[in-house]
């Protein structure tokens, strides 16, 4: 049989050193976790986000930045809007829901109500008026949502003034005005005294003479053909012309 081996025994000093090392490592881990929690609490956490279009067709996207639990320092509602003309606007609304007695711990209800009021605004990033929460029975200082900075739209180039278009009635009056019509010259009528006087009636033409008949020759030819025969045609024609002169 082999002789029994002696058991190794730990000294009390070694045990104390091991115990102290374990305690130091545990304390270091606790300190690091506490530091990380403080850092998280100091930074706002990103809440819900979404999009909406205002009554004046401003396309906006919003994002809610709320503080970490245990730090009642208010919250911020960040907006980014684009106007119908293409201009980009950025703004933020800040408020303190904890100062409204009606909300209490229901901060989400507070922000939901204010977001609904913001959607009804024609120009969310250009309206300087604060957003009052309707759910607060009594208005307290800091319960409204304020915008610290209000951006402005880019200046548009000035357009030259346009001449007003004339109405059809005025144009017709200008065309038909007496000044634009040509003047009519009065007619001159010879009076009995030998002078001329102005008149509107035309001068009547003198009647033809009673004895002048332009168709006398034609009438003689008709009489000759009627009363003269072929045998005595030349002699009868002479007498007819002599008689009618």
From Swiss-Prot:
Tissue and organ expression note: In the adult, highly expressed in brain with lower levels in ovary. In the embryo, highest levels are found in the brain and spinal cord at 14 dpc and expression is almost completely restricted to the brain by 18 dpc. In the adult and postnatal brain, highly expressed in the orbitofrontal cortex where it is concentrated primarily in differentiated neurons.
Secretion signal, residue range per the UniProt entry: 1-28
Region (Disordered): 33-52, 136-216
GO cellular component, one term: extracellular region
Phenotypic consequence of gene deletion: Mutants display a range of anxiety-related behaviors including reduced time spent in the central area of the open-field arena, reduced activity in lit areas of a light/dark transition test and prolonged latency to feeding in a novelty induced hypophagia test which assesses the drive to drink a sweetened milk solution.
Biased composition range(s): Low complexity: 170-180
InterPro entries per record: FGF1-bd (IPR010510)
Compartment(s) where it occurs, according to its Swiss-Prot or TrEMBL record: Secreted
Subunit structure: Interacts with FGF2.
Protein name: Fibroblast growth factor-binding protein 3
Source organism per UniProt: Mus musculus
Gene: Fgfbp3
């Amino acid at each position: 049989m082999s002789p029994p081996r002696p058991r190794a025994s730990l000294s009390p000093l070694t045990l104390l050193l091991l115990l102290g090392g374990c305690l130091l490592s545990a304390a270091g881990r606790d300190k690091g976790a506490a530091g990380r929690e403080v850092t998280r609490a100091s930074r706002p956490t990103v809440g819900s986000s979404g999009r909406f279009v205002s009554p004046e067709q401003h396309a906006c996207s919003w994002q809610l930045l709320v503080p970490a639990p245990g730090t009642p320092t208010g919250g911020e509602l960040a907006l980014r809007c684009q106007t119908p003309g293409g201009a980009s606007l950025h703004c933020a609304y800040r408020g303190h829901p904890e100062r409204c007695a009606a909300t209490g711990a229901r901060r989400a209800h507070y922000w939901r109500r204010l977001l609904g009021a913001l959607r009804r605004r024609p120009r969310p990033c250009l309206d300087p008026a604060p957003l009052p929460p309707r759910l607060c029975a009594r208005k307290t200082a800091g319960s409204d949502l304020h915008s610290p900075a209000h951006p402005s739209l880019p200046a548009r180039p000035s357009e030259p003034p346009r001449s007003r278009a004339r109405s059809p009635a005025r144009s017709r009056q200008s065309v038909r005005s007496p000044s634009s019509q040509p003047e009519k010259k009065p007619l001159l009528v010879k009076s009995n005294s030998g002078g001329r006087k102005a008149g509107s009636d035309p001068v009547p033409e003198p009647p033809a003479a009673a004895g002048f008949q332009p168709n006398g020759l034609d009438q003689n030819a008709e009489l000759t053909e009627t009363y003269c025969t072929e045998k005595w045609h030349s002699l009868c024609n002479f007498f007819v012309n002599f008689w009618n002169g």
